[in-house]
Amino acid sequence: MDQRSLFGLTEHLEALSKHGDPLEVLEATVDFEHFRGWLVGLGYGDGSKGGRPPFDPVSMFKALILQAQHNLSDARMEFMIRDRLSWMRFLNFDLGGPTPDENTIRLFRDKLTESGALKRVMKAFDWQLRKKGYIPMAGQIVDASLVPVPKQRNTDGEKQAVKDGKSAREIWPDEPNKAAQKDVDARWTLKVGGKVRYRPDGTPLPMIAVPTFGYKSHISIDRRFGFIREAAVTSASAADGRMLRRVVSTRNTSGEVWADSAYRSQSNEKWLASKMLASRIHRRKPAGKPMPQAAARANAKKSSIRARIEHVFAHQKNRFGLFIRTIGIARAEAKLTLANLAYNMDRLIFHERRAVGG
């Protein structure tokens, strides 16, 4: 690159900074180097013998965060890294130098998942939050959200084989290419949504149920700061209540736990009490009877607090455009863990800006 071109590039990057490059804010707020110890040693080259030297693992991890923020496919991510100067600067790649292709990005994410390093990085970032003073406090809120995947077109016999727990290779032994494209971990469920509406006589109108195929993201956030502290992934058909123990933490400064009525059961109430946690779970309406006024008022009060977790899912779906393109629950969990990390990083930027602004 000649001197004139280099000067023009420097001038262009300075203009990006002047107008407020959000990636510079992310770089200044999150200590990405802190994750290096969990990332070093992963196979993050292109996988070919005698091929190009491996890319820096921290740069590769930052690329996955960008991918989660924009919900890009691996192929599109390869293009965007080459296309955007601000992204290249954030990832520490040189203009005209080598950048990771889609296979390298996929292989790095798979190794990050298979080695368990991704979960350790999530915990390491939580430690980073605590070090900055964002400890879990004021109780925790639990909820789950459906995340769709591309629908599968299977015969009745194939559907039954999936329900029986058979692997894709067992169902399509003579069609390896087809088996590789089949997700046998995702499940169908009915998503009932919308505001409850009533007839003139006061009886509720039927709710709209929309069939959804995919996975379910279970999370808990701390009430004070709104960071995702615990998370789990299941198929879409898994019952919310059964995941309470997976996502409730005993490390919050308050023992209060908020959740909707799907989490209310004698078993869960007994377990919370055994952990010295106070249940703030919604009460269910008695079958065939009106909801007692006291219970209705208590539920309304709980809803005002519990609604905060809906902002997390809205952020991931509206800003990130969260949708899973990968196959299998292991890769789905990786995608959702990265989305949770990306959300927590955005949340940290929000709190840090508010602290500076007073």
What is the meaning of each model-derived region?
Residues 242, 267, 288-295:
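Short, charged, surface-exposed secondary-structure boundary motifs
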Residues 51-55, 258-267, 285-287:
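Acidic, metal-coordinating catalytic cores used for nucleic-acid/nucleotide bond scission
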Residues 16, 23-65, 69-70, 104:
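Basic, short loop/linker segments at the boundary and entry of helix-turn-helix/winged-helix-like folds
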Residues 75, 79-82, 92-96, 100-274:
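Polybasic low-complexity intrinsically disordered regions
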Residues 1-40, 351-358:
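Charged, often Cys/His-bearing segments associated with DNA-binding zinc-finger transcription factors
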Residues 270, 297-358:
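Basic, amphipathic alpha-helical segments enriched in Lys/Arg and hydrophobic/aromatic residues
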Residues 275-283:
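Short hydrophobic/aromatic-enriched beta-strand-loop microsegments
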